[in-house]
């Protein structure tokens, strides 16, 4: 489960195998997680030798791209509640607001600010207002890009600069308009390449072939998709 899944595998090595999500109102079949094993590799050998749960295996958290300063040792995952104690801050648009209940359940300590029709440049002021109000997280996630085309990488860089070097993720978008989808996802990926502290969580890839995750508009996750979205993070 993103940050949570990486920590869970540390605590329970058997989770390193491809996992099926716990049943929710409708059970999605996730194909990968934002932070799990990119190639299925986990460094479990040393931990298994001592046979002790007190020495969890060391794993490499991954997304499509992982912030180089993400320290998952600070976070704990509770398999019973499928929740993580990471104090994540998330700013997004209607996709974020529509999945916020599922995300909040997965990250009880998270601050989530999602608003319909929010465009990426508007998130600069939103982030500043939220942090000024004390809503600052150790990991920042931006879920933006469904409301208009990102004009240039500088718009993305402004948000990156605001985080002050914190581990930061951008989530790719899924749209029925390839021209917007391709442009915006490319902009996010190019910005991530240039900033070591920035990672990419690939909702576009995660939801590929899963029309059951989406409402009829092809953009917004339904109940099943909301759980899949939160699981991905």
Predicted regions and their residues:
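Short, well-ordered coil/turn elements that cap or connect secondary structure elements
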Residues: 105-107, 163-165, 193-195
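N-terminal secretory targeting modules
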Residues: 1-89, 133
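Conserved beta-strand segments of alpha/beta enzyme cores
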Residues: 109-111, 167, 197-199
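Short, conserved loop/helix-junction motifs that constitute active-site signature segments
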Residues: 132-135, 159-165
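Catalytic His-Asp segment of secreted/periplasmic serine-dependent ester chemistry enzymes
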Residues: 181, 185-233
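Conserved beta-strand termini and adjacent loop/short-helix elements that scaffold enzyme active sites
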Residues: 113-115, 171, 201-206
């Amino acid at each position: 489960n993103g940050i949570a899944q990486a920590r869970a595998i540390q605590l329970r090595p058997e989770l390193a195998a491809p996992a099926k999500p716990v049943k929710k109102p409708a059970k999605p079949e996730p194909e990968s997680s934002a932070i799990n094993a990119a190639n299925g590799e986990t460094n479990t050998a040393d931990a298994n030798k001592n046979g002790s749960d007190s020495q969890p295996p060391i794993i490499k958290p991954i997304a499509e791209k992982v912030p180089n300063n993400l320290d998952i040792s600070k976070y704990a995952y509770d398999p019973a509640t499928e929740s993580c104690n990471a104090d994540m801050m998330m700013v997004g648009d209607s996709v974020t607001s529509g999945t916020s209940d599922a995300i909040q359940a997965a990250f009880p300590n998270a601050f989530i600010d999602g608003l319909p029709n929010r465009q990426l440049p508007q998130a600069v002021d939103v982030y500043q207002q939220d942090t000024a109000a004390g809503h600052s997280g150790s990991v920042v996630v931006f879920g933006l890009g469904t409301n208009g085309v990102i004009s240039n990488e500088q718009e993305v860089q402004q948000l990156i600069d605001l985080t002050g070097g914190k581990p930061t993720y951008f989530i790719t978008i899924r749209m029925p308009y390839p021209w917007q989808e391709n442009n915006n996802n490319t902009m996010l990926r190019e910005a991530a390449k240039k900033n070591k502290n920035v990672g990419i969580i690939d909702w576009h890839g995660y939801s590929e072939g899963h029309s059951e995750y989406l409402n009829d508009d092809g953009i917004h996750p339904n109940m099943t998709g909301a759980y899949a979205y939160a699981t991905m993070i």
